[in-house]
Amino acid sequence: MAQTVALYYDFREQMGRILAIDYGKKRTGLAVTDVLQIIANGLTTVPTHTLMDFILDYVKREPVERIVVGLPKQMNNQPSENMVRIEPFVNRLRKVLPQIPVEYVDERFTSVLAHQAMIDGGLKKKDRQRKELVDEISATIILQSYMDSRKFKI
């Protein structure tokens, strides 16, 4: 029995969280998985100018295996105007944390889905107008979308 527990513990220590980023001009929503990568949860929303410091602090405290960033595309599949801000951030992130892979995930409709999730969850109109909450929920949707896409690759 003790061996089984030790093996389970070692297994958990080898896995890291997946961190999702819904990058915005002013605010950035963040979401993260549990260490077993089963559940996507909203983490927080931070001012974008503090994002890199927040991530660096977070990866010191928590094991992060991968980072996924919402890829803003227009309906015609062309990059949106926000891409000019996201690409330099992702390039810097890859340089500062070369041991953690960074991937893009299509983020079309995440804000619409976030608002619908808030309505379905019974949030009052005043709470639904909190942009920070919308950004955090959008990051959670990006993360869940990434996790769902991996299920089909296994």
Regions from the PLM with identified roles:
Residues 2-21, 25-26, 31-154:
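Phosphate- and other anionic-substrate recognition elements at nucleic-acid/protein interfaces
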